[in-house]
């Protein structure tokens, strides 16, 4: 993020921010008052609408279409209630992160802080001398989890794009205009899905060259529109002629609940884009309202799609609800529209990881080589995500494992602990400490359960073909 500019003063042009420190308000940081929350380059900051678009795009698309199966694993009653609780807790943790960042900015006279810096400075407020002396590890840990999570999402997107386009093309000869019957068709074999991934590679590389969030908001808007249209088509189908739900269990067997929990935590992990968006917003005081509005929309979407999808297809629900739709061109287009949305989402997910890794690389080269090194590093990172998608068998489970570890840590474990360390020296109520401890324990349970389930699936060769990449658990 732009905070990296403060760490690497000799590196002038890498950031997505259009305004350099020399172009910032003439008062500089010396006029930064404790009661205000200013930022450099305010004239080039995003509007509230652009911020909302980015927030929706950063959350919708990750695990959304797998939520009906998640509700099945929890039960018709317990599933939606659990999604609501997890959504509330996740949004609360996002609010904690923003609150702590604001508080530390006022205390330290900083214009803005990213996630890693917020944790680092929060640990410096700890009553423990050992923690204060090792506070820099807080930033390193957060940056590591952010990079793993965001690049993991990017790997999944490669597989998602390849699998969906491959399915549409291979079923083209058998696809009809009759959407009343869900008929099984014989697929016409085409090239391997890995070749589809390589086909998308140059286009995603070009997309990753966009380093300005205001420009990315245009692509986010396109992604939101395409996903919005595809979701309307899905809703239009699943609300028709809903079967009698009396045979569906209100509470599923407890042995399948861990599968629900891991999927839900994965779906609600959007905390990585919160501070980057808040730091770029022109009027940051309005960000909490945008955050709660956007996450309320997302939570309602998650609960409704998960519940209605399970009600419509019952025990036959598949890993992606699109696999249950009729084989006609109308619903085949859902895959294409959603794939377009995922394509543009790649840029936003990639942005977070790039702004952590690239500044450290570019700051070590002469100024005349900065742009070349920047673009080369972006190209290499995109190629790495593509190579991982091509080479790693059962990529869905590998990403599930990474997501369970990173998402639980970033979304549920770290923010409550950050609140305790940040406010401990100023007096924090026992009730708040208890609340934060319970949330962190919940996140740790998600970490343990998600990791266990992913590892268990990875060592079970009979569950599916280990040589086939799949995103069925996520799309």
Swiss-Prot record:
Function: Electrogenic proton/amino acid symporter with selectivity for small apolar L-amino acids, their D-enantiomers and selected amino acid derivatives such as 4-aminobutanoate/GABA. May be involved in the efflux from the lysosomal compartment of neutral amino acids resulting from proteolysis. May play a role in specifying sites for exocytosis in neurons.
Feature: compositional bias, Basic and acidic residues: 1-15
S-S pairs: 179-328
Residues on Cytoplasmic side: 1-50, 99-140, 211-214, 278-288, 363-371, 418-438
Molecular function terms, GO-annotated: ABC-type taurine transporter transporter activity; active monoatomic ion transmembrane transporter activity; alanine transmembrane transporter activity; amino acid:proton symporter activity; glycine transmembrane transporter activity; L-alanine transmembrane transporter activity; L-proline transmembrane transporter activity; neutral L-amino acid transmembrane transporter activity
Residue stretches spanning the membrane: 51-71, 78-98, 141-161, 190-210, 215-235, 257-277, 289-309, 342-362, 372-392, 397-417, 439-459
Stretches in topological domain Extracellular: 72-77, 162-189, 236-256, 310-341, 393-396, 460-475
Disordered: annotated span: 1-32
GO cellular component: a single term: vacuolar membrane
KW Disulfide bond (keyword) present: yes
Reactions the enzyme catalyzes: glycine(in) + H(+)(in) = glycine(out) + H(+)(out); L-proline(out) + H(+)(out) = L-proline(in) + H(+)(in); D-proline(out) + H(+)(out) = D-proline(in) + H(+)(in); L-alanine(in) + H(+)(in) = L-alanine(out) + H(+)(out)
Entry keyword Glycoprotein: yes
GO biological-process terms attached to the record: alanine transport; amino acid import across plasma membrane; glycine transport; L-alanine transport; neutral amino acid transport; proline transmembrane transport; proline transport; proton transmembrane transport
Major localisation: membrane
Glycan attachment residues as annotated in the record: 173, 182, 469
Topology versus the membrane: Multi-pass membrane protein
Subcellular location: Cell membrane; Apical cell membrane; Lysosome membrane
Similarity comment text for this entry: Belongs to the amino acid/polyamine transporter 2 family.
Stored InterPro entries: AA_transpt_TM
Organism: Rattus norvegicus (Rat)
Source taxon at top rank: Eukaryota
Keywords from the UniProt entry: Amino-acid transport, Cell membrane, Disulfide bond, Glycoprotein, Lysosome, Membrane, Symport, Transmembrane, Transmembrane helix, Transport
Protein name: Proton-coupled amino acid transporter 1
Tissue expression remark: Widely expressed and predominantly expressed in brain. Within the brain, expression restricted to neurons and not detected in glial cells. Abundant in regions rich in neurons using glutamate and GABA such as Purkinje cells in the cerebellum and pyramidal cells in the hippocampus.
């Amino acid at each position: 993020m732009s905070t990296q500019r403060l760490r690497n003063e000799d590196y002038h042009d890498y950031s997505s921010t259009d305004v350099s420190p020399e172009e910032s308000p003439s008062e500089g940081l010396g006029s930064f008052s404790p009661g205000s929350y200013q930022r450099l380059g305010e004239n080039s900051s995003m509007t509230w609408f652009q911020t909302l678009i980015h927030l929706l795009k950063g959350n919708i698309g990750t695990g959304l279409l797998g939520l009906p199966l998640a509700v099945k694993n929890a039960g018709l009653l317990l599933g939606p209630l659990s999604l609501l609780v997890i959504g509330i807790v996740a949004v609360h943790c996002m609010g904690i992160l923003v609150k702590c960042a604001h508080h530390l900015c006022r205390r330290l006279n900083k214009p803005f802080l990213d996630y890693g810096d917020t944790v680092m400075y929060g640990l410096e407020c700890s009553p423990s001398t050992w923690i204060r002396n090792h506070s820099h590890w807080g930033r390193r840990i957060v940056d590591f989890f952010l990079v793993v999570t965001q690049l993991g999402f990017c790997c999944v997107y490669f597989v998602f794009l390849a699998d969906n386009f491959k399915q549409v093309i291979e079923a083209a000869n058998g696809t009809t205009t009759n959407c009343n019957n869900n008929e099984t068709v014989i697929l016409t074999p085409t090239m391997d899905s890995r070749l589809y991934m390589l086909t998308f590679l140059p286009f995603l590389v070009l997309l990753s060259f966009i380093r300005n969030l205001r420009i990315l908001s245009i692509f986010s808007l396109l992604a939101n529109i395409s996903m919005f249209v595809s979701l309307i088509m899905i809703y239009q189908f699943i609300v028709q002629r809903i079967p009698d739900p009396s045979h569906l269990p209100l509470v599923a067997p407890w042995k399948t609940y861990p599968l629900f929990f891991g999927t839900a935590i994965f779906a609600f992990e959007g905390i990585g884009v919160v501070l980057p968006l808040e730091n770029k917003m022109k009027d940051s005081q309005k960000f909490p309202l945008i955050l709660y509005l956007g996450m309320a929309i997302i939570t309602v979407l998650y609960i409704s799609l998960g519940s209605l999808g399970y009600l419509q297809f019952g025990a036959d629900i598949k890993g992606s609800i699109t696999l249950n739709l009729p084989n006609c061109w109308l619903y085949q287009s859902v895959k294409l529209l959603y794939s377009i949305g995922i394509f543009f989402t790649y840029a936003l997910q990639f942005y977070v990881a790039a702004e952590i890794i690239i500044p450290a690389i570019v700051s070590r080269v002469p100024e005349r080589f900065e742009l070349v090194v920047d673009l080369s590093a972006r190209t290499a990172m995109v190629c790495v995500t593509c190579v991982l998608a091509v080479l790693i068998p059962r990529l869905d489970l590998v990403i599930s494992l990474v997501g369970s570890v990173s998402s639980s840590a970033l979304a549920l474990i770290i923010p409550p602990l950050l609140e305790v360390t940040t406010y401990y020296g100023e007096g924090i109520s026992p009730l708040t400490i208890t609340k934060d401890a319970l949330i962190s324990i919940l996140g740790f349970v998600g970490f343990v359960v998600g990791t266990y389930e992913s590892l268990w699936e990875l060592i079970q060769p009979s569950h599916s073909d280990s040589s086939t990449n799949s995103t069925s658990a996520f799309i």
